[in-house]
């Protein structure tokens, strides 16, 4: 899955537009997310492991906010021969087009249906696995409870939800510490202070994070029987919930 180097915010701009998953971002997304999100490769690999354990024959897998298809590919590799269907949804046509190219590079007997739509419009049913990989944080906060409840209602008993998010902390000291650790991570991956600052400005109106407590409360209120944070690095976490 090739990607150009992310240089979107490398030059000073007079005005910073809100971040969008447009063709510019789609072209560098693979590089961008691996240089920005600590543990991303581990999360993607483990999605495949979860799929191997939880995806049942003749069921569906929903990848909500599929971007370039990394999660879908990881899952698909582990569920060969189960007569399952993966539905990968993204509201960016540029992402869908590149995802289609990436999926075509690998032969599989597992059907993948790509859908360009808002994930809030998708009918979730017969699902043994649902993935929200750094997606929920871009939805309006008032829509998040409803989406998680719809996911729960559309899942099979014993199904798994994997939710990965950037998170915030009520403790100001911890928030500052982990923010600084994340900034150091980005610096170590070659991002300049200008790039870091301009991207932060682009994201501030479109990405609103929750605390881990908020995520757990939302998930348990929706009806899930089991919840755990299975991975955390700085202010990035991945959670599992089982119906």
Swiss-Prot record:
Origin: domain of life: Bacteria
Residues at which S-adenosyl-L-methionine binds: 40, 65-67, 90-91, 118-119, 133, 200
GO MF, any single term: carboxyl- or carbamoyltransferase activity
Catalytic activity from the UniProt record: prephenate + S-adenosyl-L-methionine = carboxy-S-adenosyl-L-methionine + 3-phenylpyruvate + H2O
Stated role: Catalyzes the conversion of S-adenosyl-L-methionine (SAM) to carboxy-S-adenosyl-L-methionine (Cx-SAM).
Family: Belongs to the class I-like SAM-binding methyltransferase superfamily. Cx-SAM synthase family.
Quaternary structure note: Homodimer.
Name of the protein in question: Carboxy-S-adenosyl-L-methionine synthase
Gene transcribed to yield this protein: cmoA
């Amino acid at each position: 899955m090739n990607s150009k180097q992310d240089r979107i915010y490398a030059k000073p701009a007079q005005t910073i537009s809100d971040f969008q998953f447009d063709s510019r971002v789609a072209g560098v997304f693979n590089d961008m997310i691996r240089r920005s999100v600590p543990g991303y490769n581990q999360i993607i690999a483990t999605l495949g492991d979860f799929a191997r354990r939880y995806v049942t024959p003749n069921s569906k897998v929903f990848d909500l906010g599929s971007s370039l298809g990394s999660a879908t590919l990881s899952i698909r590799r582990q569920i060969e021969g189960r007569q399952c269907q993966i539905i990968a949804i993204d509201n960016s046509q540029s992402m869908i087009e590149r995802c289609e190219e990436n999926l075509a590079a690998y032969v599989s007997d597992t059907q993948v249906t790509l859908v360009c739509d808002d994930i809030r419009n998708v009918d979730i049913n017969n699902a043994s696995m649902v993935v929200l990989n750094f997606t929920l944080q871009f939805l309006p906060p008032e829509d998040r409870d409803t989406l998680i409840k719809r996911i729960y209602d559309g899942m099979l008993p014993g199904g798994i939800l994997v939710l990965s998010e950037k998170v915030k902390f009520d403790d100001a000291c911890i928030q500052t510490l982990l923010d600084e650790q994340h900034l150091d991570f980005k610096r170590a991956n070659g991002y300049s202070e200008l790039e870091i600052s301009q991207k932060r400005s682009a994201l501030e109106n479109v990405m609103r994070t929750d605390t881990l407590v908020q995520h757990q409360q939302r998930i348990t209120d929706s009806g899930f029987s089991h919840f755990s944070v299975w991975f955390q690095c700085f202010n990035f976490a991945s959670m599992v919930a089982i119906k």
